Amino acid sequence: MNRYQTLQKKLVPFKKGCFIPFIILGDPSIEMSLKIIDVLIENGADGLELGFPFSDPLSDGKTIQKAHLRAFSSKMNIYLCFEMLQKIRKKYNTIPIGLLLYANLIFKFGINNFYLKCFNVGIDSVLIADLPVEESNDFRKCAIANNISSVFVCPHDAKKNVIKKISLYSTGYIYLLSRSGVTGTDKKIIVPSLNLIKNLKKITEKLLIQGFGISNSKQIQKIILSGISGVICGSVIIKLIENHFQNEKKMLKNIKRLSRSLKQSTIIF
């Protein structure tokens, strides 16, 4: 049983959804990034979705683009990211940790080398934002060889043949897209249709986790009530980092409050 399955087993009987925050490693610095992760986990995060700083993050809106730049300003690179991941896994042995990255970053490092490194530092899953499932064969082979779960994005308007393929190849969880476009909290999100959720649940028992633009309790409650397993929230957290990173105490206090609120919203009474 992998960590996502363990999380699912823990949540389902109690009618709870999972809250998974997303941040960029090294934003705004290595030390502060590690403190942010501590605060998130201590205040409700059920898992982590983490990004490596990347020079051309096409799927990201302005808020997360700035996070990539702040991480680069703190001299982050792929090797320091793996060092951070090793520390995080050593401290938090039971929670699922996934990476959300871009294909070129992995390709430059060497696909098999990358997945081997992920295995060595205890990563559970890798989602490649700009990799269509139809072009994923080389990446999936290396993921399987190194015991890393693959995650693919399922659009809210996905056709049945796409749903089947994503359900088959996503071995960690299935990422449900709130809408098309780039990340950010300034656009309306879409809860996938009950028909899509029903079709997915017919063919898979994996966690269904929705991301992209989720920023408040009302959105989360609507998502969980629709039958989705949990949410990934990134921009709303990263905006707090952007606004307060020059005042660490205030930043961590605000992230603590937000994390508690977002987690509480996943619990259905």
Curated annotation (Swiss-Prot):
Q: Does the keyword Amino-acid biosynthesis apply?
A: yes
Instruction: Please give the SUPFAM superfamilies that the UniProt record associates with this protein.
Output: Ribulose-phoshate binding barrel
Q: What reaction gets catalysed by this protein?
A: (1S,2R)-1-C-(indol-3-yl)glycerol 3-phosphate + L-serine = D-glyceraldehyde 3-phosphate + L-tryptophan + H2O
First and last residue of the signal peptide: none
Q: Which residues form the active site?
A: 49 (proton acceptor), 60 (proton acceptor)
EC number(s): the record gives 4.2.1.20
Q: Which InterPro entries match?
A: Aldolase_TIM, RibuloseP-bd_barrel, Trp_synthase_alpha_AS, Trp_synthase_suA
Quaternary context: Tetramer of two alpha and two beta chains.
Task: Name the family.
Answer: Belongs to the TrpA family.
Function summary:
The alpha subunit is responsible for the aldol cleavage of indoleglycerol phosphate to indole and glyceraldehyde 3-phosphate.
The protein here is known as: Tryptophan synthase alpha chain
Task: Write down the species.
Answer: Buchnera aphidicola subsp. Schlechtendalia chinensis
